[in-house]
Amino acid sequence: TNGSGKTLKTIQKSGPDGEITTSFEYDGIQRLVRVTDTEGNVTTSTYDMGDRRTEVNHPASGITSFTYDALGNVLTKQTANLAKEGKFITYDYDYQRLTGINYPDHPENNVKYYYGGRNASQNRIGRLMLREDGTGAIEYFYGKMGEVTKTRRTMIVPNQAIATYVTQWTYDSHNRLLEMIYPDEEKITYSYNLGGQLEKVHGYKSYGYDYVSKIGYDKFEQRTYLKYCNGAETFYTYDPQRRRLQNLTVNSGGNTIMDNAYTYDAVSNVLSVVNGASVPQSGKAGGQMAHTYTYDALYRLVSATGTYTGADNKTASYTLAMGYDNMHRITSKRQILTQNNVQFNGTLNAGYDLSYTYGTETGKKFQLANVKDVNYRT
């Protein structure tokens, strides 16, 4: 860092090709003006006398420029592509409230914003009341605390009739959602326990039904129990030291259909997921599964393996290997899959080996240039 506490350089010492460095430069009043990545790609910024960024030159997107009004609102934006034709995206304001976004091409995609005046109803005084864009319009209604209580969405479907959808919300004094009415008039109600946590979800349309019958929590406010309307129950347990999910069990119809156990590394990356549920009866879906994961020193997924055992002698396994460069771009992805009696009676061996290359020309850096794909199936 420099004397003002600004970061001058970051170094990651465990990249696949050595150190990964990023350098930062500032002007005399500590504004960021230059960033250089580990491959030497440079991003620069310029500012006006009001500390407003007027230009960004990025190795991938080129030069993007901005102009402002006296109050600091963005008036125009010009990307590298628009600059070739001398065009701009423009912005309109009313008392510093954005009222319009105007595109140089396809004006039907312009966006307009309307705000409630002093006589507006439904608590809309000074608030966004209507937004129009190329897809149609959406109207907003508010409660006394400024929460959105209703929207009316009007969609313009080409060669079709105009469609309108109304959605409504009701909240309690703690601003918790109590009720939601969908455009098809289905009403969903939410119930909470004494601690303010969601406990039940109930639906009504012609007749009543529960989506979620019960949710339970522990003293750490982590979910420990969930029961759906069909009777399926999910149980959650956590490790006592770091409160990470340790086991997830799903019971339905008197059977355990999922019994997942999780392990982690010191920084909470998932190392394994093992489903120890019983192998189902003949003809039934499901089964036992196990997955393992490894990571590099930068916590990027390097490899994964998995196995499956189901009814009727169904088995499967896979391996996955990933490669990255110092810019954190994927450079390779290789997967091998073996199945027995899963999709058909017999053995299937399949896989792919992908290699990724990226653009190097100005304006195309970081963009995916080519994918070499090798597939096989036996």
Protein language model features and the residues they cover:
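Beta-strand elements of repeat-based all-beta scaffolds
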Residues: 1-378
